[in-house]
Amino acid sequence: IYGSIHEAALYDFSEMTLKQTGRYTLKAELTPWPDGIKVRKGNHFTTSWRTIQIAPEAVGLINSSLILNLNEPCVLETTDWIRPLKYVGVWWGMHLGVETWKMDERHGATTANAKKYIDFAAANDIEGVLFEGWNEGWESWGGMQNFDFTKPYADFDIDEIVHYAKEKGVEIIGHHETGGNIPNYERQMDHAMQWYTEHGIHILKTGYAGAFPNGLSHHGQYG
């Protein structure tokens, strides 16, 4: 027997966690705000659905439509503009420790390295290439994560890279890592999106890998 405890239709509400209160008992707990309040709402509100799924085989949990059906229908009138694609990118070398996000002697997102990845993508029918660590601010990692989303590092020539990718028929995937510093990102967001558009980049990956400021949680109502 396989089981899953989860939730659906989680909108403007804290995520549920499970706390073991006995050998066979669990208690649902909500991730609080820094002041201990679980959820800030008016007099009338709707909680998320809480689900329990049980199946004789693990694949039954994956194949279940329960959570899908408890969520609201898609609000988009048309979805034909959504295009899935396969991509590679400069990021795994950082996790392996052979490259860095910040600009130094092992910097991963350089113009020369970008062209190598674009060549590989073009040769293997891979539509896109993602570059992490292309913009100023990675040296602040571990602090406030003050990224600048329109200033490439000096060794990352955005215009040359975009032009090279276009010649090869490869899409550039932009990257905005907030590091959890959401206020810093929101101040720059409109300008950063326009900047990408002006440079011919129309696909974006965002990241929220760092801790939120002021004790806020990724799993609380704020996140």
Residue ranges and their predicted role:
Residues 1-3, 49-53, 88-90, 129, ...:
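Generic structural hydrophobic/aromatic packing signal, biased to beta-strands
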Residues 42-119, 124, 128:
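An acidic-aromatic substrate-binding cleft motif
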